[in-house]
């Protein structure tokens, strides 16, 4: 049983590591904090693994744990007032010219800064949207109806558009 959990946990970490890191990068300001937050998420997934009941999909379950840990971190330490992103970690293909690379990095940095200014519920929806999740899964994770998810996302997109174009 314990060995099966270890294998299952390893598969989860292998499959979802990048997704978890992206979410952690919104809630943690610097690379060290992101690593710590990632470790907290992994630990919470490991602790909760025996209680996984398969009522929701594994991805939905992992999102819930990840987002709950990240939001608790944000509330506990109050570190996120204005987010910054480490642009060294952004992978940009070598065949683009340098000016496009700089422009893209600046746009991404500005987007993360705008996301950091949102309230927790809006920030959560944006993160789920950026993960390209269907409204049904967003609804399962947040507890909002699918229609409410769509309405809130539309409003948040307008807020982000305004923030990005200031």
Question: Model-derived features: where do they sit?
Answer:
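Arg/Lys-rich amphipathic alpha helix in sigma70-family domain 2
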Residues: 51, 64-84, 104
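Sigma70-family region 2
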Residues: 2, 29, 42-57, 76-77
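Internal acidic/polar
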Residues: 80-104, 134-135
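Hydrophobic positions on the alpha-helical face of helix-turn-helix-like DNA-binding modules
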Residues: 41, 65, 125-126, 138-139, ...
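DNA-recognition helix of helix-turn-helix
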Residues: 140-166
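Structural recognition of an alpha-helix C-terminal capping motif at a helix-to-coil junction
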Residues: 36-43, 56-68
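Short amphipathic alpha helix immediately N-terminal
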Residues: 117-137, 141, 166
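A short, charge-rich alpha-helical start-of-domain segment used by transcription regulators
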Residues: 1-22, 26, 35
